[in-house]
C-alpha cells in the first residue's frame, strides 16, 4: 500500500504523516518511512548532526500500527494511540535511514485493541 491509499485510512497529513508505505506479512503489518532530512522535527535536533527524536519514532510506530486496523477504519473512526511500554531506542536514526516497524494485534478487549 502506497502513501495515497494510506491517506484514505489515516487522518494524518504532511508534515505529520509518517508512513510512506505498508504491506502485510502474514499477521504482521510492516510500515516504512524514509527520513529525507528536510523534516521539521530535525530542525535544531541537532545542528550539524540531525537525529530523529524518540517521540517521533514512537509516532511512526503508532501510525504504522494503526494500519493493522484498516478493515475497521471507515473514515468515521479515528484510532487513538494511548500508550507504549518498555520502549528502547538502540540506534540513532539519521537522514537517509528507512524506519521500518512491524506490528500485530495481540489482544482485543472491547474497544481497546492491543498491538
What are these regions (language model features)?
Residues 11, 26-27, 93-97, 104-115:
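HotDog/MaoC-like acyl-thioester-processing domains
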Amino acid at each position: 500500500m502506497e502513501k495515497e491509499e494510506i491517506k484514505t485510512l489515516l487522518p494524518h497529513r504532511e508534515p505529520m504523516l509518517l508512513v510512506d508505505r505498508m504491506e502485510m506479512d502474514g499477521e504482521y503489518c510492516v510500515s516504512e518511512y524514509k527520513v529525507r532530512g528536510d523534516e521539521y522535527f530535525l530542525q535544531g535536533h541537532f545542528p550539524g548532526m540531525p537525529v530523529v527524536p524518540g517521540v517521533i519514532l514512537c509516532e511512526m510506530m503508532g501510525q504504522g500500527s494503526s494500519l493493522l486496523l484498516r478493515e475497521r477504519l471507515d473514515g468515521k473512526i479515528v484510532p487513538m494511540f494511548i500508550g507504549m511500554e518498555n520502549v528502547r531506542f538502540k540506534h540513532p536514526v539519521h537522514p537517509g535511514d528507512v524506519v521500518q516497524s512491524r506490528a500485530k494485534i495481540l489482544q482485543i478487549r472491547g474497544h481497546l485493541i492491543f498491538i
